């Protein structure tokens, strides 16, 4: 594993014209944030040694280097999901590579179903904590020397970055929610009974990604900020049939607000 991480990092280091310290993982319908990136240099996943290739509609599969505002960044346009058949080691491989390249901060975004009755479709939810409901843990097996055997997860999402996001949202007049995200393996959307269970467990939103990458980022000592776009509701009386296309549409409509918050945050760190 370490040899593959180092091989991939060496390959990317040769292609990089700058030394960014901020990375962004873009989820379903949120890939259009890349239009905000200037001085772009793109590498297709299929051309990167040891990188998996995303198979999901709406995830184009590129690594993008450039500037967001005045900061050098790297963006993953398309992520890898456990439900695609990848192991957790493969799902989180890019985060290990980020650590090897010296990244300090990771911004993650996703589309999620809301279980909180106060939420509406299109809301942005700042993730303040998560529940890991995946059947396999990304740190299972021999510990990689990037972090401790038993990592602390008491601040999986940086409180400093959360406070900064709330400040920016207030300045810009953008409505945001806060809550707990629960990560499940998918690929089915949740049944009404599952939504109810997740709410009882303490989740405000549910999705099929993010948690594995955040766990590994914490293991590597990378600070994390996460935001979910609420694309459907699992609240009694508000549950409707949902499709991937509808999820993408809702995420696309929320994208300008998320872009504003992300851009401002990255410029201020």
Name each model feature, range by range.
Residues 1-153:
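Metabolite-binding pocket within alpha/beta catalytic cores that recognizes anionic/polar moieties
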Residues 104-105, 204, 223:
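Short acidic/polar active-site loop segments enriched in Thr and Asp
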